[in-house]
Every structure is written in structure tokens, then in C-alpha cells.
């Protein structure tokens, strides 16, 4: 019989989907297991027969399914306002590019967000965060990018820090100052990139407000040369990088981000084989964002088969934002990734666990149920992981465990 230490907590009689690629079974499934949690981490995984049937801090899950906590590795959670009117315009035939050129798009949200009080932004973002937590999310990336000036970018990152301080969910904050050219720099995008590189990145990094730098390399964002200036600045300071690339056209953004060993290349609908090979060589994760593909009614799908062939890890995220993916649901994103992009349900699960952890640089501590990893996991009223992907309108979450505590 396995001896437990004072303070240990046990979840026994579980069906465990470890998402450990070293396990032979689909989803890393093993039955009749028990998790021993100690000081917020998984201490051990043992057959339940090795543990007492009952006792203090022993939770009998009656055969329920347990998976790693979900990870949403790409969100724009902190913003004010909405862009419902733009959606109507698109339904009537206007393109995303046309709306952006008319001062809509990202800059419309920038105006609303700049005018919004920090406390109001916090309350809006907190409600969104808790919606994701209710689906079993335990690690969440939050980008800035709706300030496009030093003061408001800092305000957004302070909101992310305040959310993290609640200890309800892990937050990975990302500086996305290179999201769009603000109205005041409309005729001088290079001048805005200078502001990003010489002021925003170094000052906000010095304050410890973000973990990585992101950018939007696209015809409605920044060109390759401008994007490279951002990457060079970040890497010179030792900051991890990532990028929104190849969403609406093929500019070579994935190759660029991969050349700087980017954590991830996101969207990638127009990615070509050269870009896929570069991602493999750079150790860059491909992040699929099916919500934006759906909402923009795009037709160019990411090259999933090429990503498989080159063994590029593929993550899936909600891309929750007011303009192109107003879906605050990672379950829905998983379903869309399967239906629209052809992922298998197991690939979708890998995309919101171990591959999503890699996209945030957290692969050594998050995204799998393994000894030594963080005790972030979810107990489901389900028999198979596929059920969560199959029926996104139903949430079978039974229990969410964060840092070893039921939350």
C-alpha cells in the first residue's frame, strides 16, 4: 500500500487521459488510476489498488474522465466595445480589408479601449476569463494590442496582471503593440514601429508586464521589414516572440518568425511548404484559429496535411476578440478545428494541452498529466475525451483543479 504524506491529496477511481505522447493509447488513456497531488504539483500516478479507498483528502471520482487543464494560447481578452456593426457590413459584402481601410477593424476597438477606464476593462475581462475557466481552462494567454500607444498598452497589461493576481487561472501576457498602425500614425507606419521598438518594448519589458512579443505581419498590419524590426528588438532583449502570419495572404511571415525561433506562428491559412519547413526547423508551433476563419467566411484553409508531414506541433485557440472571433469558448474552437480544418479529435485535444503549452513556452510544466507537472486538471462527466469536442454546446465539466485545489 502506498504511503501518503500529510497534506497529500488524492483523486482516485479515475479514467485518465494524460495527453502524454509516450503513452501508447489514444489520448494517453489509462483506466483505474489515482493521482497524488503534493504542493500544487502531480507527485505520482499509481494504480488505485495501491491507495486506501477512503480517508482525508481522498476524492473518489467514480470512474470519471480526467484530462489536463485546457490551455487557450491565443486570446485578445482585454478590450472595450464590440464590432457588431462591422459584422453586418461584412455580411452585406464588405471585406475585412475594406473595413480596416475605412478606419474600422482594430482601430475601432482601439478608440473604445483607450476611452475605457481601467477598472471597467478589468471587470469586462474578468467575466470573459471566468467563462473560459468554466470550460476547464487553467492557463490563458492574453494579448495587449488595443492601445497602440504606450499608456494604453500598459493599461491593458496591468489588467492582465490584475487578473493573474486573483490566482484563479494562470495568465501568460503578450505585448502586441505591433497589431495595427494607429490613426495618428496613419501616414507613417515606420514611425509607429520606431515607437514600438524604441519605447514600448523596452519600457514595458523593464516593468515585467509581459512574457513575449507578438506582431501582425499582413497587408492590413505590417510588412516583413517592419515586422523584422520588432523581432530584432525583442530578441536583442532576450524576449520570446510569436506572430500573426499568413492569415489573409502569403507574405513569408511564418518563415520570418521561425528564423527568430518564434514560439508560434498563428492563423497560417496561407502558409506554404517553405513556411512549414521553416517552422519545423525553428521549433515553432502552428496555432490554428478556426473561429476567425469561420467568422470572416474565409475559404483558404491551413495546410494541415503539410504540418503533419513535417511534424510541426499544432495548437488550437479561441482567438477571442471583438472583430474576427467573438467566441469565448475553447470547446467550440476544438470542434471547429475538426470540422473545418480536418483535425482529429485527439489532435484537437493535443492542440489545447501539450502543444498549446509549447506555444507559450510552458511545455515543461503544463499540458500533460505527468509526475512533476503542475496539478492543473479537469474531471469530466464523460467517458471519452471526444465527447467534449463533439458537443460544444454542452459542458460536462464536473470539477476543475487548479494548482492542486478544487476551484
Curated annotation (Swiss-Prot):
Similarity comment: family membership: Belongs to the metallo-dependent hydrolases superfamily. HutI family.
Catalytic activity: 4-imidazolone-5-propanoate + H2O = N-formimidoyl-L-glutamate
Pathway stated in the Swiss-Prot or TrEMBL entry: Amino-acid degradation; L-histidine degradation into L-glutamate; N-formimidoyl-L-glutamate from L-histidine: step 3/3
Positions contributing to Fe(3+) binding: 74, 76, 244, 319
Biological process (GO), any one: L-histidine catabolic process to glutamate and formate
Protein name per UniProt: Imidazolonepropionase
Residues that hold N-formimidoyl-L-glutamate according to the record: 146, 321, 323
Record carries keyword Chloroplast: no
Residues annotated for 4-imidazolone-5-propanoate binding in this entry: 83, 146, 179, 247, 324
EC annotation from Swiss-Prot or TrEMBL: 3.5.2.7
Subcellular location as annotated: Cytoplasm
Principal location: cytoplasm
Name of the gene: hutI
Role summary: Catalyzes the hydrolytic cleavage of the carbon-nitrogen bond in imidazolone-5-propanoate to yield N-formimidoyl-L-glutamate. It is the third step in the universal histidine degradation pathway.
Organism, scientific name: Salmonella typhimurium (strain LT2 / SGSC1412 / ATCC 700720)
HAMAP family: HutI
Gene Ontology molecular-function annotations: imidazolonepropionase activity; iron ion binding; zinc ion binding
Keywords: Cytoplasm, Histidine metabolism, Hydrolase, Iron, Metal-binding, Zinc
Pfam families hit by this protein: Amidohydro_1 (PF01979)
Positions that bind Zn(2+): 74, 76, 244, 319
CDD domains: Imidazolone-5PH (cd01296)
Amino acid at each position: 500500500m502506498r504511503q501518503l504524506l500529510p497534506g497529500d491529496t488524492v483523486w482516485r477511481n479515475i479514467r485518465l487521459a494524460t495527453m502524454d505522447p509516450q503513452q501508447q493509447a489514444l489520448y494517453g488513456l489509462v483506466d483505474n488510476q489515482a493521482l497524488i497531488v503534493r504542493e500544487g504539483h502531480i507527485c505520482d500516478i499509481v494504480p488505485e489498488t495501491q491507495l486506501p479507498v477512503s480517508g482525508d483528502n481522498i476524492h473518489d471520482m467514480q470512474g470519471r474522465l480526467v484530462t489536463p487543464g485546457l490551455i487557450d494560447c491565443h486570446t485578445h481578452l482585454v478590450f472595450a466595445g464590440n464590432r457588431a456593426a462591422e459584422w453586418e457590413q461584412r455580411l452585406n459584402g464588405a471585406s475585412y480589408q475594406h473595413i480596416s481601410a475605412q478606419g474600422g477593424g482594430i482601430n475601432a476597438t482601439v478608440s473604445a479601449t483607450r476611452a475605457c477606464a481601467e477598472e471597467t476593462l478589468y471587470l469586462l475581462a474578468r467575466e470573459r476569463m471566468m467563462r473560459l475557466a468554466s470550460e476547464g481552462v487553467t492557463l490563458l494567454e492574453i494579448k495587449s494590442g488595443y492601445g497602440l500607444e504606450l499608456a494604453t498598452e500598459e493599461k491593458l497589461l496591468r489588467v492582465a496582471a490584475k487578473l493573474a493576481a486573483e490566482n484563479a487561472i494562470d495568465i501568460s501576457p503578450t505585448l502586441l503593440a505591433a497589431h495595427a498602425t494607429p490613426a495618428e500614425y496613419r501616414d507613417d507606419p515606420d514611425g509607429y514601429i520606431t515607437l514600438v521598438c524604441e519605447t514600448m518594448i523596452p519600457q514595458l519589458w523593464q516593468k515585467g508586464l509581459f512574457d513575449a512579443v507578438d506582431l501582425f505581419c499582413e497587408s492590413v498590419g505590417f510588412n516583413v521589414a517592419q515586422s523584422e524590426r520588432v523581432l530584432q528588438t525583442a530578441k536583442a532583449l532576450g524576449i520570446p516572440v510569436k506572430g500573426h502570419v499568413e492569415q489573409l495572404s502569403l507574405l513569408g511571415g511564418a518563415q520570418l518568425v521561425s528564423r527568430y525561433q518564434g514560439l508560434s506562428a498563428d492563423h497560417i491559412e496561407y502558409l506554404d511548404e517553405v513556411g512549414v519547413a521553416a517552422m519545423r526547423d525553428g521549433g515553432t508551433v502552428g496555432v490554428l484559429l478556426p473561429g476567425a476563419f469561420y467568422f470572416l467566411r474565409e475559404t483558404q484553409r491551413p495546410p494541415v496535411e503539410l504540418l503533419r508531414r513535417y511534424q510541426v506541433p499544432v495548437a488550437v485557440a479561441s482567438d477571442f476578440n471583438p472583430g474576427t472571433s467573438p467566441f469565448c469558448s475553447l470547446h467550440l474552437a476544438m470542434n471547429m478545428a475538426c470540422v473545418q480544418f480536418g483535425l482529429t479529435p485527439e489532435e484537437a485535444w493535443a492542440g489545447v494541452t501539450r502543444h498549446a503549452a509549447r506555444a507559450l513556452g510552458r511545455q515543461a510544466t503544463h499540458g500533460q498529466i505527468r509526475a512533476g507537472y503542475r496539478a492543473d486538471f479537469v474531471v469530466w462527466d464523460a467517458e471519452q475525451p471526444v465527447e467534449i469536442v463533439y458537443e460544444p454546446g454542452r459542458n460536462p465539466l464536473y470539477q476543475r483543479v487548479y494548482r492542486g485545489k478544487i476551484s
